[in-house]
UniProtKB/Swiss-Prot annotation:
Its main location: membrane. Residues 1-26, 81-101, 159-195, 260-272 are extracellular. Keywords: Cell membrane, Disulfide bond, G-protein coupled receptor, Glycoprotein, Membrane, Olfaction, Receptor, Sensory transduction, Transducer, Transmembrane, Transmembrane helix. It comes from Homo sapiens (Human). One of its GO terms (molecular function) is G protein-coupled receptor activity. It is found in: Cell membrane. Residues 51-58, 121-139, 220-236, 293-323 are cytoplasmic. CDD domains: 7tmA_OR2T-like. Odorant receptor. This is Olfactory receptor 2T35.
Length: 323
């Protein structure tokens, strides 16, 4: 039996990878692994800083910690398998493993909602500062975050079983480096056009609702900032919002290409590059954008490093005295 026959009768899929036949797989492995380490470290540090420093116990940083958790999930669900495939000739992924990837990656819908809520948080902080403690109290924040996670999870619970229920009789080779729904559906030997249309409508809706919140929020913020007499107030307002605008631009740019543009604009190579952008690069960029442009986060990091340095000095001094 040839390779094609084996693939058709296997319960596994085969991932072709980010680059089908990389000229320098070792170099690609080193680059992706470095990005992975930086992304994981940056997001975990962000989560720990927000948890440990009482000055960061505010709605904005609580939402930011949830963003870091989601980004950690995205990169952990795709990159380890990608790195394994770069080192191994066996590029198979089990049916269950593929379904797990699809489910967790549909949580990206939750990140859309979370970015919309972060824009609303900035709107309240800039336009209604006196009512901020009331409008963004702990109960409201928890409700908003739970809603984001539930929204993304419901998307996964609906799309994953339907996608994996189609018969895959053409091939088991997925032209991608992870199980993305459009790439998996190309293997089906039945008509998936109705499902793809419904999925397209669902994705557009999940994009437009948060994007509308973001657009309205920042329109009000710009109008409020324009009416400010204080140059310091304007600078602070722009500094507060600029990091979020950068993250939204990067994330929604990739999402717009993937979910909104018609099929004629898509090629497997372009799709893989864009997917790498939002599953690998964005989780690395998000915490860096927020931390490098945020004095509170930088101060919290210095405080933690100072504690570590003091503890180490005390240990060394104790050892010297005992010696």
């Amino acid at each position: 039996m040839g390779m094609e026959g084996l693939l058709q009768n296997s319960t596994n899929f085969v991932l072709t990878g980010l680059i089908t036949h990389p000229a320098f797989p070792g170099l690609l492995f080193a680059v992706v692994f470095s990005i992975f380490v930086v992304a994981i470290t940056a997001n975990l540090v962000m989560i720990l800083l927000i948890h440990m420093d009482s000055r960061l116990h505010t709605p904005m940083y609580f939402l930011l910690s949830q963003l870091s958790i989601m980004d950690t999930i995205y990169i952990c669900i795709t990159v380890p398998k990608m790195l394994q495939d770069l080192l191994s000739k066996d590029k198979t992924i089990s049916f269950l493993g593929c379904a797990v990837q699809i489910f967790y990656l549909t949580l990206i819908g939750g990140e859309f909602f979370l970015l919309g809520l972060m824009a609303y948080d900035r709107y309240v902080a800039v336009c209604n500062p006196l009512r901020y403690p009331l409008l963004m109290n702990r109960r409201v924040c928890l409700f908003m975050v739970v809603g984001s996670w539930v929204g993304g999870s419901l998307d996964g619970f609906m799309l994953t079983p339907v996608t994996m229920s189609f018969p895959f009789c053409r091939s088991r080779e997925i032209n991608h480096f992870f199980c993305e729904i459009p790439a998996v559906l190309k293997l089906s030997c039945t008509d998936t056009s109705l499902y793809e249309t419904l999925m397209y409508a669902c994705c557009v809706l999940m994009l437009l609702i948060p994007l509308s919140v973001i657009s309205v929020s920042y329109t009000h913020i710009l109008l409020t900032v324009h009416r400010m007499n204080s140059a310091e107030g304007r600078r602070k307002a722009f500094a507060t919002c600029s990091s979020h605008i950068m993250v939204v631009s990067v994330f929604y740019g990739a999402a717009f290409y993937t979910n909104v543009l018609p099929h004629s604009y898509h090629t497997p190579e372009k799709d893989k590059v864009v997917s790498a952008f939002y599953t690998i690069l964005t989780p690395m960029l998000n915490p860096l954008i927020y931390s490098l442009r945020n004095k509170d986060v930088a101060a919290a990091l210095r405080k933690v490093l100072g504690r570590c340095g003091s503890s180490q000095s005390i240990r060394v001094a104790t050892v010297i005295r005992k010696g």
